[in-house]
A protein has these predicted regions:
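Conserved phosphate/pyrophosphate-binding and hydrolysis machinery centered on Walker-type P-loop NTPases
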Residues: 13, 17, 39, 43-47, ...
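Amphipathic alpha-helical interaction modules
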Residues: 26-70
């Protein structure tokens, strides 16, 4: 499996395979496991999804760092990928982490679809 390099490529691939709703449901499920209730519908537009996720990750980094780390653990975002990011700009960091979260969730959905 080759992971998409951009948010747009990820969404295009998810839509082409008709897995976008499953991606959204996987995100909601993992965020709920981390006790973070994201209030959005499974029919959410990709641009709105990206914005909500970005805002949520930014707030977690700024205000609830332990919950942010717990979320990364639950979603199983690569620790090495996180360590490679530049943490000097929190806004940029939160955007990059949001994409890492989306990529990891996409992996889960894709593998479940492919091998089940």
């Amino acid at each position: 499996m080759t992971l998409p390099a951009t948010f747009e490529a990820l969404i295009t691939e998810a839509n082409n395979l008709k897995l976008y709703k499953k991606l959204v449901l996987q995100l909601k499920k993992d965020f709920l496991y981390a006790n973070i209730d994201l209030d959005f519908d499974e029919d959410i537009l990709p641009s709105s999804l990206k914005l909500i996720l970005h805002e949520t990750v930014y707030k977690l980094i700024q205000e609830k760092f332990a919950e942010y780390l717990n979320l990364l653990y639950i979603i199983d975002v690569s620790e090495d990928a996180i360590k490679k990011l530049d943490g000097s700009d929190t806004l940029q960091l939160s955007e990059e982490v949001t994409f890492l979260i989306l990529k990891r969730e996409w992996q889960k959905v894709w593998f479940r679809h492919k091998y089940s």
